[in-house]
């Protein structure tokens, strides 16, 4: 059997991108927008397999059923892994259905979290997550009430600072994690810097760099799940399972703090699932979820989405009422640079 494997730059090769999307849809899958490159397999001038890479995640992997059992899956995965390594991406993840886990195990992937029979998260290392948790454990602090916040801060607002202040005042120590993925309006580097500036003067807080084990909803692949509600549920289950069973025990976290969410139904539903999944009895110690009411200014809750809208309007007076000086300065400089390049 003569197979031809080809690399496709999805952002440049529109005809092949459309062909891959059609092939995936024939198999009840879809090609997600963040996919950068793909490997396709052709047999007798017919597309019979594909796999794509987005950041450090392998996804959109499918094989024509008529050729399953011919070793095509392993060939495709091997080529996809070679591409990832050439791009300098050695720490890889993939999400798939549990029924496919054995296939990927044969290519060197291990399961690290699972949402029932619907989704499993795998990575190409048996020890990497354990090593990361050992590194986290070096930042343990003494105390009976150890808190955590996971923050996107897109961008950092006075509401974020208030949440950190309140949580820190209620704990013996607070661990603050930043969502790492660059799937927000502002880069991870900029968001981390604004948080670092914004929490100046708040005691008993450790700011942790972003981690691939804090799963962003924006980058969670749902190409193999048909309904949006199922995608959201699987994301929260996998993300919160990793937090409760691996990250939190490393730091002996007992409480997780969130702000109330009056504006975004998606985040509000996530907070509800968080309470259910973190507080339920289980093998790992339960974590109490503490929901703090958002502060309000000028007739509405202080939120990053509100700041982004005011930023687009260049309403600096209104922005200044909602963000610390560091965020305001950053946004004004960003607006100036955008104006100069326009």
UniProtKB/Swiss-Prot annotation:
State which Enzyme Commission number(s) the record gives.
Answer: 6.2.1.22
Keyword terms of this UniProt record: ATP-binding, Ligase, Nucleotide-binding
SMART domains named among the record's database cross-references:
Citrate_ly_lig (SM00764)
The enzyme's first-digit EC class, named in words, is ligase
Query: InterPro entries annotated for this entry?
Result: Acyl_CoA_acyltransferase, Citrate_lyase_ligase, Citrate_lyase_ligase_C, Cyt_trans-like, GNAT_dom, Rossmann-like_a/b/a_fold
What domain of life does the UniProt record list for this protein's source?
Bacteria
- What GO molecular function annotations does the UniProt record carry, in alphabetical order? [citrate (pro-3S)-lyase] ligase activity; acyltransferase activity, transferring groups other than amino-acyl groups; ATP binding
Biological processes annotated in GO = biosynthetic process
Locate the N-acetyltransferase domain: which residues?
A: 1-127
Entry function: Acetylation of prosthetic group (2-(5''-phosphoribosyl)-3'-dephosphocoenzyme-A) of the gamma subunit of citrate lyase.
| Protein name per UniProt | [Citrate [pro-3S]-lyase] ligase
Source organism per entry reads: Klebsiella pneumoniae
